[in-house]
Each structure stands twice: as structure tokens, then as C-alpha cells.
Amino acid sequence: GTGAREIGYMFGQYKRIRGMFEGVLTGKGLSYGGSLARTEATGYGLLYLTEELMKCHGESLEGKTIAVSGAGNVAIYACEKAQQLGAKVITVSDSNGYVVDEEGIDLAAVKEIKEVKRGRIKDYLNYRPNAKYVEGAGLWQAVKVDVALPCATQNELLIDDAKALVANGTMIVAEGANMPTTLEATQYLQ
């Protein structure tokens, strides 16, 4: 839940206390020396990488199914770019559970839930009643997708998840979060 507003406050306090205008925090607004498109950069970049990986295998993202974990900036903008590139994202999650929408995630609903209402991802069912919400469990063993994008948290994709993804035919696992795949799972996927 930390955004430009909170970072701006911390940066303002740093500037007030230290009397310096230095770039000590990432995620600042433009008026504080932040970067344009910072919010979208990680999610978009993840998809540009994924697109290039697909090309290496003679494939494209067009028509592929993607599982995304998380519902923060990285996940939201990864979903957005994936949809722009012709893929169908079927999952998003938060710390309480995950949603599977086989028709494709309604990104406008996710943005309203997470960015406007600051709600939980289970509220997605109010927008798309045909979707499925699963509380508590990890999503990686529950879905069959072409691409898996862990964008939620560290160590979220475990060895059993990696084995399930491979068994289900997932072609690519690309990391959006910081170290979301455990070492054991990473070694298995290689």
C-alpha cells in the first residue's frame, strides 16, 4: 500500500530534517524528482522481457494464457501490458487468496478494488460473479497457463509449484517481484 503519496511524505521529511534535495527514495512523484512512468515500469518491463523470451522459442504472447500473482503496481501493470500484447491474464491475488477468471481478468475492476477502494481481491466477484475466488491457497498449482508471472512477494513460488507449472505445460516463468521463486524452485525450472 505504499505509493507516491507516502514516499513523498517521507522524502519531504528527509528534506526538512537534512536540508538536502537528494534522490534517496524511489517512487517519488515528479515534483520531488521522481521518474516518469515509474509506476508502470516494472510491470511493463516484465512483459517486454517475457515477449522477448517467447520470441526466442518462436512464439508470441498473442492468445497465450498468463497467471499473475499480486494486485499491486507490478501485477496491475504486468496485466495491462499482457492484455495490450494480446495475452489473456486469468489470475490475480492478494495476501488472502486469489481469483481465477477464465474469461480474462477485468483490469478496470482490479484497479478500482485495489487502487480506489483499497479493498481485497475477493471483492472481484462483485464485478465478475462467474470468476472463482480461493482463499488462503497459492495459485501456482491450481492453474494451467502458458506463462507464470509471480509479482506478489518473496519466496511465493515453491518447488512443488514449479513442478506443477512444468507438469501443466507452462513455457515461461518470469519474475516481477523481488526474489519470488525459491532457490530450489529456480534450480528446478532451469
Roles of regions detected by a PLM:
Residues 16, 51-56, 139, 154, ...:
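Conserved helix-loop functional segments at active or binding sites
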Residues 34-142:
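Glycine-rich phosphate/diphosphate-binding loop of Rossmann-like nucleotide-binding domains
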